[in-house]
C-alpha cells in the first residue's frame, strides 16, 4: 500500500509493468544480439572515448582528439567496465543497457510528473521505445552508441520531468502558487 492507502499491486499496474517490460526486453534483445550485425565505425565513438578516459585515469584524455566533448556522455557508462572487460562488445552492451535503463527511467518520470497513470505511462514509454527503433538509422542513433542525439532526448525528458515536478509542487497546497 502507498502512503495514501491505495493498493500498489493492481491489475492495471501489473499490466503496465508487463508492457514496459515487453518494450525494454525488445530493445535489450536488440542491444545484446542483432546490434552486432550493424556495428560499424559510427558505433565505436562512445567506447573509444571511454577507453581514452580510462587510459588517462580521468573523465577525459588530453592526448585524445574528441569529435565532440560531452561531459555527461555515454562514455561515463562504459568507462568503469573497460577495466573489467576491455574494449569489447561486453563493455559496449553493458553501457548501452545502462543507457536504456536511464532512458526508460527518465521517460517514466516524465510521464508520472505530468500525473499520468502508470498504465498510460507504460503505453507511452513502450511506444517511444518502439518508435525510436523503427528504422536502422534510429536504432543506430539510440541503441548503437550514445551521442548528442540520444543524450538530447534523454536530457529533454529529465528536464521536463523536473519542470513538471516543480510546477506540481508549486501548485500543491502550501505551494508557491496557492498562497
Provide a role label for each language-model segment:
Residues 58, 76-98, 103, 114-116:
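Juxtamembrane segments of multi-pass membrane glycosylation machinery
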Residues 17-21, 94-120, 158-162:
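Transmembrane-helix motifs of polytopic, lipid-linked glycan transferases
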Residues 32-41, 54-79, 89-90:
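Membrane-proximal lumenal/periplasmic loop motifs of glycosylation machinery
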Residues 46, 92-99, 145-156:
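Alpha-helical transmembrane segments of polytopic membrane proteins
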Residues 165-179:
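Short hydrophobic alpha-helices at membrane interfaces in multi-pass membrane enzymes
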Residues 3-19, 117-118:
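N-terminal membrane topogenic signal
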Amino acid at each position: 500500500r502507498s502512503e495514501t492507502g491505495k493498493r500498489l499491486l493492481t491489475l492495471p499496474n501489473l499490466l503496465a509493468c508487463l508492457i514496459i517490460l515487453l518494450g525494454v526486453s525488445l530493445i535489450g534483445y536488440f542491444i545484446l544480439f542483432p546490434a552486432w550485425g550493424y556495428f560499424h565505425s559510427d558505433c565505436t565513438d562512445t567506447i573509444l572515448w571511454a577507453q581514452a578516459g580510462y587510459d588517462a585515469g580521468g573523465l577525459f584524455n588530453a592526448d585524445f582528439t574528441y569529435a565532440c566533448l560531452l561531459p555527461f556522455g555515454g562514455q561515463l557508462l562504459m568507462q568503469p567496465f573497460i577495466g573489467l572487460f576491455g574494449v569489447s562488445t561486453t563493455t559496449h552492451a553493458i553501457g548501452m543497457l545502462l543507457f536504456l535503463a536511464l532512458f526508460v527511467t527518465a521517460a517514466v518520470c516524465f510521464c508520472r510528473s505530468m500525473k499520468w497513470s502508470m498504465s498510460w505511462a507504460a503505453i507511452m514509454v513502450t511506444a517511444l521505445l518502439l518508435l525510436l527503433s523503427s528504422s536502422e538509422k534510429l536504432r543506430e542513433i539510440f541503441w548503437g552508441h550514445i551521442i548528442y542525439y540520444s543524450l538530447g532526448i534523454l536530457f529533454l525528458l529529465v528536464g521536463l520531468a523536473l519542470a513538471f515536478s516543480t510546477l506540481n509542487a508549486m501548485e500543491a497546497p502550501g505551494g508557491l502558487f496557492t498562497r
